[in-house]
Amino acid sequence: MDISVVIPLYNEEESLPELYSWIERVMKANNYSFEVIFVNDGSTDDSWEVIEQLKATSGETVKGIKFRRNYGKSPALYCGFKEAQGEVVITMDADLQDSPDEIPELYRMITEEGYDLVSGWKQKRYDPLSKTLPTKLFNATARKVSGIKNLHDFNCGLKAYRKKVVKNIEVYGEMHRYIPYLAKNAGFKK
C-alpha cells in the first residue's frame, strides 16, 4: 500500500464527509493505493456514526478507531500509527485546515527525495492573533532547542513520514508536537 492517512479527531462530524471525499479524489487522481484511518478521540457528537457510514460506503479504504473518552492527540496518533500499513504515513487534522491537495508533494518528497519526514507549514492561518503569536514563539523556541532549523511549524498537523519512522517512535502525553525531534533522536536524518 502506498499511503496511510491518519486523522485524529474530536467532534468533527460535519467536516468528515468532505474531508474523506477530498482525500479520495486526490488519491484516485494519482493512482495511489491508500487507507484512511480516523481515530475518534472520545467525540461527544456523531463523529463515530459518520465514520461508520464512511466505512460502509468506501470499501476497505476507511478504518476507524474509537476511544471511549478524550485521551488527546498523541495517543490518537500513536494508535493510528500502529494500524498504518502504507509505506508513507500522512497525518492531518480533521478540521479542513490541512489540504489533501498537498499529499502528492509530500509523498514525492518521501519517495523520490529520500526524506524520512516532511512537515507542512500553515503559511496562512485563520486563527486570532492570541493564538498565532504564542505559536510563533513556540516554534522559534522549539527550533532552537531541538536543533531542527528548517522546520517552520511544529504544530502543523500535516506531516508525512516514511513508515519506519512511525513504527520506531513512541508518542504519548503531548509529544505529538515533538515527533520531528523524536525522529531525529531515533536516528532519522532527513
What are these regions (language model features)?
Residues D2-S4, E35:
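Cell-envelope/extracellular polymer assembly enzymes that use nucleotide-activated donors
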Residues E14-E18, D45-L54:
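Acidic helix N-cap motif at the loop->helix transition within catalytic regions
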Residues Y32-S43, I65-K66:
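Short beta-strand/loop segment that forms part of the nucleotide-sugar
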Residues N40-E49, L96-Q97:
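A conserved acidic beta->alpha catalytic loop
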Residues Q53, K63, F67-R69, K73-E83, ...:
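Acceptor/aglycone-binding surface of glycosyltransferases and processive sugar-polymer synthases
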Residues F67, M92-A94:
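Catalytic metal- and UDP-sugar-binding loop of GT-A-like glycosyltransferases, i.e.
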Residues V89:
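Short aromatic/hydrophobic "clamp" motif used to bind/position activated sugar donors
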